[in-house]
Structure formats: C-alpha cells, structure tokens
Amino acid sequence: MLLYLKMSNAPLSYQQWLQRAVARLSVEQSSEDAKIDANALLCFVTEKSKAQIMAFAETRLSEAQQQRLELLLQRRLQGEPIAYILGEKGFWSLDLLVSPVTLIPRADTECLVETALSLLQHYSSEAALSILDLGTGTGAIALALAAELTQQKRDYRIIGVDRVAESVLLAKQNGQRNHLTNVEFMQSDWFSSLPPQKFDFIVSNPPYIAENDPHLKQGDVRFEPLSALVAKKEGLADIERIIEQATTFMKTGGYLLIEHGWQQAEAVQALFKRYNWCAVRTVLDYGGNQRVTYAKWDR
C-alpha cells in the first residue's frame, strides 16, 4: 500500500517530503538506504546541502520542485541507480559525472587506487611516473591517482583509454570538472590504439562478471552497460588479454594491477604466473573480499 502513497498536491515542507519519500522507498530497500536516497534527491532538486535541509526543515517546496522530485522518485522506485538519476557520483576525493554509458564508480575500486599509491611509494620522489588506466570509464581511477600525485607534487604522466567514445568524452569532462586537465584520455580497445611505449604502472577495472551470473538481473547492474560488466571465459577473458598484452607495454620493474570478482583471485593469480609475471599478490577490499591482484614485470 505504501508503494502507492502519492505526494500531496499541497506544498510540502522539506521534512514532510522526506518522511513520505522514505516511506515509499522503504518498501523496496532498507530504511537507512531509503533515507540516504531521499536526502540525495531533495538536496539535488533544492540545491541545498543536507545541513541546510535539516536547519530549514519547515521550508516549503515550490510546485515545480515538488513535481520534479516526484518524477525523480518514480525513477528510483523503478530501481534506477541514484547515481544515474543525479548524473553524478563521489569517488575518492572527486565529484564525477556519470551516465548510463559507463559503470558507476564504486567504493571497492578505491582499493585499487590505494594499492597503486602504496606501490608508488617504492619509487623515488624525483622519478617521473608513467601510468596507464585501461577501460577508464568515468576516469575515476586515473583521476584519483592524478589528484593524489598532484597533491604530492610528483612528476607524472597518466593516460586513460576506453573502447567507448562517449566514455572518453565523459572522462575528459571529469578531468576538467576536477581541475585535473593534465590526464590524457583516448579511445582504444585495451592496447590496440596505443603507440609503442612503456609504463611504470598499468591499472584496470575490466569486465569480470560471467555471462550467466544471476546477479546481472539484480540491483544497479541491471541498468549498467553489459559491455563494461561481462566477459567470456567465466569473466576472465578480458583479464587474460590484459595480462598477456601488458608485457609489451610494461617497463622492467613495473606493476600491473587488476580489479576482479571476489571469487576470482586464484584464477587471476594463475594467469599472471602463466604469462611470467612475478611477485603476485592479492589485496582485500573494505569488505574483506579478495578484490585486487597485482604483479611485477621483471624482464
């Protein structure tokens, strides 16, 4: 019954709208998630911070605001990810534009950024670092690394590539939005369009979900591009291609870091060893799952 609780036509206060929106959203999700989503929608439409919403809880919505909120709320009730509705998503220290042509950046991927930054500490602070981000999407990984290296006043060169032209454009926009315009983004199917060159680091969050995985019919991934999610060979086809071809683009002593599914660590480690990488290690994400495997190229 709550699902059909429509918003009143009478002007609602911020507090009233939040209460009703949370009630409707709670039918399909936890009350805590419902509160987060309702607050995000209200802040987005009113252009107010959460603190301002709380401080002025009795402020009345305009008719136009109320109508727009209802449209956005309906989209969320139908399962569309909040990031696609708002067109933006926070990642690391960045505020990123997102669209349905790209994956939504997730907290799990911050584990990849953290691991790369940890390994970067092994390099001299005077060294000019070269980094390649494969399948860059929104540019999240490349830009997060750029933000940290800029703050550290390191000399670096970062290239992000993606097969989808719209993703490359979005990544460039995110670079401008976050004042990180020194990161280069280009269209390429993995390494195919890259000129011959060598990198200290190659990082990637490639497609790694198996084609028949039942999770593809659940949650946010229903709305995300399948090409960015799914890979053949039980989700390992693109990972294997990257591990094999990266050897041509890797400096001696350089590292390749790959995000993967929580049950794929053993298989990814085996692929690294098959193609003669050394010092293979797997890192846990914030939830304690095996999420990132990296290896060193020592040839």
What are these regions (language model features)?
Residues Y208-D238:
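Mobile active-site "lid"/loop adjacent to the S-adenosyl-L-methionine
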Residues C111-H215:
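Conserved SAM/SAH cofactor-binding pocket of Class I
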Residues A83, I209, Q263:
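Active-site beta-alpha loop architecture of Rossmann-like, nucleotide-cofactor-dependent enzymes
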Residues L97, K233-K296:
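Conserved Class I SAM-dependent methyltransferase catalytic core
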Residues A116, L145, D220, I242-A246:
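Class I S-adenosylmethionine-dependent transferase superfamily signal
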Residues L42-L119:
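Conserved AdoMet
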Residues L41, G79, T109, I141, ...:
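Residue-level signal for inorganic ion chemistry
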Residues M1-T46, A51-M54, E58-L61:
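Non-catalytic accessory regions of SAM-dependent methyltransferases
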